[in-house]
Design a protein with these regions (language model features):
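Hydrophobic residues at beta-strand termini and immediately following loops
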Residues: 1, 44, 134
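Glycine-rich, N-terminal phosphate-binding loop of Rossmann-like dinucleotide-binding domains
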Residues: 2, 24, 73, 110, ...
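PLP-dependent aminotransferase-like
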Residues: 6, 10-71
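Residue-level signal for well-ordered alpha-helical positions
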Residues: 11-14, 33, 113, 137, ...
């Protein structure tokens, strides 16, 4: 997509969630797309004493009436990284509640490799049909102004539904070539 933000917008237009949970603090773009979709937003304020790291308070707010959760790993703007065990618990809880989880990993490449292997979600995407994983070349390869992001999802039907929300020619040739060069 033309950056991760365009993909977030395509996701909410494709799925039309009634209720979206957004942890606070978080990237303002989640609120923007939720409002564009006409969704009700439930804000879950993360405790400062825990460094704004999500925990039980977030899980407790994710109930059967929640349709979607937007969460960044690492968090933008705090930089807090969710651990593997917590993420697995979060994804399993959301699966049981029927909640689609959009995990924004646009800053994951900036995490230290020695820390609790932060990039494991990509390898486990097939285990969670309710998981949408977003990343962006813009951040990882220091290409401000080059709008290029991607969304990974194991559910083929859902991928197609989201793709149909994107403009036919949404990527410039420059962005495409830059993405190919970065992938090589």
């Amino acid at each position: 997509g033309n950056g991760a933000s365009e993909l977030f917008l395509a996701v909410v237009h494709a799925l039309k969630p009634r209720n979206i949970v957004i942890p606070v603090p978080s990237f303002y773009g989640y609120e923007y797309v939720a409002e564009a979709a006409g969704s009700y937003i439930k804000y879950v304020y993360l405790p400062e004493e825990n460094g704004f790291r999500p925990g039980r308070e977030l899980l407790q707010e994710l109930t059967a009436d929640t349709d979607m959760l937007f969460v960044a790993n690492p968090n933008n703007p705090t930089g807090q990284l969710m651990g593997r065990e917590y993420l697995q618990e979060l994804l399993e809880h959301c699966r049981q509640q029927g909640i689609t989880v959009v995990v924004d990993e646009c800053f994951i490449e900036f995490c230290e490799s020695g820390r609790e292997q932060p990039k494991f979600l990509l390898g486990e995407i097939g285990q969670y049909e309710n998981l949408l994983l977003a990343r962006a070349f813009t951040k990882s390869f220091a290409m401000p102004g080059v709008r290029l992001g991607y969304l990974v999802c194991s559910n083929a039907e859902l991928r197609e539904k989201i793709r149909r929300q994107l403009p036919e020619w949404n990527l410039s040739v420059f962005a495409q070539r830059a993405g190919i060069a970065c992938a090589e």
